[in-house]
Amino acid sequence: MATSGMLFALQFSKYKGVLSRRGRLFPESYTGFKKRPFFLIFISLKKEEEMDKDKENVLKMAKENDVKFIRLWFTDILGILKGFAITVDELEGALEEGMGFDGSSIQGYARIDESDMIAKPDPKTFQIIPWRPKENAVARMFADIYEPDGTPYKGDPRWVLKRALKKAQDQGYTLYVGPELEYFYFKSSDGVPQFLDRGGYFDLTPLDVATELRRETILTLEAMGIHVEYSHHEVAPSQHEIDLRYTDALTMADNAMTYRLVVKEIALKHGVYATFMPKPIFGQNGSGMHTHQSLFKGNRNAFFDPKDEFHLSKIAKSYMAGILKHSKEITSITSQWVNSYKRLVPGYEAPVYISWARRNRSALVRVPMYKPGKEKATRMEFRSPDPACNPYLAFAVMLAAGLKGIEKGYELPPPVEEDIFEMSEASRKKHGIDSLPGNLLEAIQLTEKSELVRETLGDHIFQKFIENKKIEWYQYRTHVSQFELEKYLPIL
C-alpha cells in the first residue's frame, strides 16, 4: 500500500500540486516523492511491513478508544511545545504522507517565503490524552518535520537528536538517559510567586493539594505509557520532583516534553500554576534536570568494567572526559535562559565547577555508587542542565561531547571528593578545576566558537539559536529591574 502511494504521487508530481494516492493535494513546492533516490523509497520490504503494522495498530487504537482528534506535537528550537489537531478521518493519510502546515511563525523555523512544512506523525508515540473526555477522545503523536521535497527539516530539534543517535548507532552504541526534572507549584502565574507548601527535601507534607497534584500527575503519566520510578518533595518550599524510568534518549526526550505539559495541565486543572523556570525564587534552590546517562552495546552496559576501581570502563571514562572537556561550550544548550545562570551559583547545590566525583554533589559530573548485580545501572550523572532546556538539543550535545571523548581517547582526570565550594581559588587552580560560564552571554560566546555544537545542531539551528539568545541577552541587559529601582532610586 505504501509503495503504490509513493508511485502514485511520483506520477502526478509534475503538476502544480502534488496529488497523493489518497487524493490529497500538497503545495506545488512539495516534490518529496520526485527527488527521493529510488533506494531510499524501497529500502526493504521488512521496513515497509513494520511501518504498515505500526499504522494499523494506531488506526485500531484510535477506533477502539473513540478518538476523534489527534494532536500532532513538535517543538521549536527553544523546546516550546507546538502542535495542531487533525480529525481521525485524516489520520491514515497523515501516517502515510504527513500533513502540510505553515512553519513561518515558529521560532527558528523557515521564513514566510519558504514556510511550507510537512509534519509526519511517529506511530510509536500514539497515546490517548487522559485529561480529555473519553467520549470523542483526543490522542497525541509526536511528529517529525520534513521539507516540501521530503527531506528531514534541519530546523527540527527531534531530527537533530535522531541524527546524533544514528551516529552513535553506527558505532554500535545506544544512549540511555534518565533525567530528574524539578519544578515548583505556585498559587498563580501573576508574577508574584506564592508557595503552595512549606515542605523541604523528602518531607511528607500533610495531605494537601501538592500531594494530590503529584499523585494525579503520576497516574496521568502512567496512563500515557510513561513509567515513573519515584517522586518526592525537593529542598525548596513548593518544589517537587518526579523521576522517569531510564530509557532510550529519543523516547525520553518525547517523555520529557509530555511530562512538562502533564505537570502544568494537572496543576491548571486544580487552579495551581506549575513552572519549570530554573530559579523563580531568590534565596532558594533552583530547579535542575540532573541527567543520568550511559551507553549500551546491545544488552550490555558499555560503561561497566568489573575490574576497574570505580567499575567504569575505558569507554565510560572517555565519555565522561568528553562531557567535562566540552561542558562550557554546550552550557548554553543545557542552560539556555538568562534565568538559568541565577541557578548556577555557589551555595544552592547546583554545580559551578568542572570536575567529577562519586559522592560529592558539588561536582559537575557524579558517578552513583556501584551495587553488585546492578551492572546495567552503571551510569554518569550530568548535573548542570535545567528542566527548561530543549531536551532534544540537550541530549544531542551531551552525546556528541561524550562520543568526541571516546573518539579522541580523552583521559579522565582524578575525582574530586572535597566540597569544591569550600576550596580556595588557589586550591581549585592546583586541582585544575575550571568553572562553567557565569551568564548567558558568556555561554553563548563559548558556543559560538564551538565546532562540536555547530556540527551537532547543524548550521540552521546553530545560527538561529545564537541569534535568539543574543536578542534575549540584549533585552535583559537593557531592562531596568526592580532590584535596581529599590537599590538606586532612594539614594541617587
Question: Where would I find each of the regions flagged by the language model?
Answer:
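Alpha-helical and His/Cys-centered functional microenvironments
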Residues: L7, Y15, S294-F296
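Leucine-biased recognition of intrinsically disordered, low-complexity hydrophobic segments
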Residues: L7-L10, L19, L25, L40, ...
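Targeting/processing segments of secretory and organellar proteins
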Residues: G17-V18, G23, G32-K35
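Short, Lys/Arg-enriched N-terminal segments with co-localized hydrophobic residues
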Residues: Y30-E50
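Glycine-rich, acidic/polar active-site loops that bind/position phosphate-bearing ligands
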Residues: M51-L492
